[in-house]
Amino acid sequence: MNIRPLHDRVIVKRSEVESKSAGGIVLTGSAAEQSSRGEVLAVGNGRILENGNVMPLDVKVGDIVIFNEGYGVKKEKIDGEEVLILSESDLMAVVG
C-alpha cells in the first residue's frame, strides 16, 4: 500500500469481526458489529508542537490498536482495501 499520512495521522486496517452469534446464527447488516480494533499500516512523522518541534508518535507500523471511531475518522479505499485515517489521539490503546 502506497500511502504516507501527514503529521499525527495514522492509517489503520480494521480487524475482521466474527459474523456469527454465540448460537451460530450468521449476523448481517446492522446486527453485525464492526470491530474497533485494527492494525497500523502507516504513521505520520509526528505531532507538530507549538515551538515547531515534532513529537514522534507512540505507535508504529504493525501495532494492533483499539480506536475510537468518532468525528474526524475518515474511511477511504486504498488499493481496493478499506482503511481508516485517524489522528493518534483517536487511538485508545495498543494491544499486546
UniProtKB/Swiss-Prot annotation:
Key words, A-Z: Chaperone, Cytoplasm
Predominant subcellular localization, coarse grouping: cytoplasm
InterPro entries linked to this entry: Chaperonin_GroES, Chaperonin_GroES_sf, Chaprnonin_Cpn10_CS, GroES-like_sf
MF-aspect GO terms: ATP binding; metal ion binding; protein folding chaperone; protein-folding chaperone binding; unfolded protein binding
GO biological process terms, semicolon-separated: chaperone cofactor-dependent protein refolding
Subcellular location: Cytoplasm
Domain of life: Bacteria
Membrane keyword on record: no
A GO cellular component entry from the record: cytoplasm
Protein family per UniProt: Belongs to the GroES chaperonin family.
Record-linked NCBIfam families: PRK00364.1-1 (NF001526), PRK00364.1-2 (NF001527), PRK00364.2-2 (NF001531)
PANTHER family, sorted: 10 KDA HEAT SHOCK PROTEIN (PTHR10772), CO-CHAPERONIN GROES (PTHR10772:SF58)
Function comment: Together with the chaperonin GroEL, plays an essential role in assisting protein folding. The GroEL-GroES system forms a nano-cage that allows encapsulation of the non-native substrate proteins and provides a physical environment optimized to promote and accelerate protein folding. GroES binds to the apical surface of the GroEL ring, thereby capping the opening of the GroEL channel.
Subunit architecture: Heptamer of 7 subunits arranged in a ring. Interacts with the chaperonin GroEL.
UniProt name for this protein: Co-chaperonin GroES
Protein species of origin: Shewanella halifaxensis (strain HAW-EB4)
